[in-house]
């Protein structure tokens, strides 16, 4: 088993979970800042937004998780703040971040669809990297299996939990997000085929479909009325994206890159 603590500095400990999130964040900011000028924004617009949105998104992700696990946290109130042990719900962070984005764009007089298109591939890459935080914490896994011989030994060893090998759903989602990121980056090189909102719509459909399937493999999902919460959200986001694409193309929306 890999030590979840990357290193210690006196009484302070830096967990691999945090390292994965921070690496994903830095790469996401770099990619978004690089793309911003092509959408008539500045890198400062991106950085200022991140400084506001990131801490709020972490808080939102934690609140989302705690809310659906309140039966546990109501009896262990001190654990609510122990985010280094895991328990950050991605959808909670995305919902919070999106709300902050619309408020930020309103006050900065920026186009929120432009901002979402810029953010989508960056977020997808950050999610691909961030999922490895679940690997180090031994969470977000699936049912017990007899062997995982198709995986490298370090993953097999880390996925040996409670006396059994576990389906590495974190890895499936990480790879799914990475593939989606590559598709967007290639697609973005052909702007004539793109309209404003196509990138964020693709993200919602791609991530939503992947999460819908992979979530069904997990054994530690947040539940609501006997169904996994993330599956509810995934279906909703897929429907929203499909409706948005249909309306946008029917109305012959604005091209992704404007001269």
From Swiss-Prot:
Protein's cellular compartments: Cell membrane
Residue ranges crossing the lipid bilayer per the database entry: 12-32, 46-66, 83-103, 109-129, 167-187, 194-214, 226-246
Binding site for a 1,2-diacyl-sn-glycero-3-phospho-(1'-sn-glycerol): 131
One MF term in the entry's GO annotations: phosphatidylglycerol-prolipoprotein diacylglyceryl transferase activity
Protein EC: 2.5.1.145
Pathway(s): Protein modification; lipoprotein biosynthesis (diacylglyceryl transfer)
GO CC annotations, alphabetized: plasma membrane
Major place of residence: membrane
Enzyme category, top tier: transferase
Key words of the record: Cell membrane, Membrane, Transferase, Transmembrane, Transmembrane helix
Organism domain of life: Bacteria
Keyword Transmembrane helix assigned: yes
HAMAP family attached to this UniProt entry: Lgt
Family: Belongs to the Lgt family.
NCBIfam families in alphabetical order: lgt
Protein role: Catalyzes the transfer of the diacylglyceryl group from phosphatidylglycerol to the sulfhydryl group of the N-terminal cysteine of a prolipoprotein, the first step in the formation of mature lipoproteins.
Family matches, as PANTHER family: PHOSPHATIDYLGLYCEROL--PROLIPOPROTEIN DIACYLGLYCERYL TRANSFERASE, PROLIPOPROTEIN DIACYLGLYCERYL TRANSFERASE
Record protein name field: Phosphatidylglycerol--prolipoprotein diacylglyceryl transferase
Organism: Streptococcus equi subsp. zooepidemicus (strain H70)
Chain's gene name: lgt
